[in-house]
Amino acid sequence: MLTPYKIADYCKEYQPEWTCTMPDGCPPDDVLVPSEHPFFRLAKQSDTYTTDDFKSYAEADPQRHWGEQLPLAVGLSLIDSETKARRNLKLPMFRQYQGIIALVLNPTDGVVRQTGAHRSHYTWWRTRKFQMSNLTMLKI
């Protein structure tokens, strides 16, 4: 389930410690708070995930000037359906990815917002409370 929140209310209730220093306006004012909500993330390897699979674009390329895209660049991309994640693996633009990570997010893990042209794409602003031990690699 995803519950609409104002980021100020979320911060007051959960007192998040973000995984990085957030730029102004990030996370945005209107967010969704997950509660036992499934998401999927593409992984570099087909049989395991690593901490590199959870690096944001901004972490992976810190010298790049992100401009207005910085709020999205510090977040992580998620997909809201396994079927759509599997389809994405077949697209040329995602050829560097070989696997799919299934994860279930809760309020202390951070907030999400639907972003981009595809309704299945979400950006996740992660907190330090997120535990990578609760992830599952899907068979491809």
Predicted regions and their residues:
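ADP-ribose/NAD+-binding catalytic cleft of ART/PARP-like enzymes
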Residues: 1-69
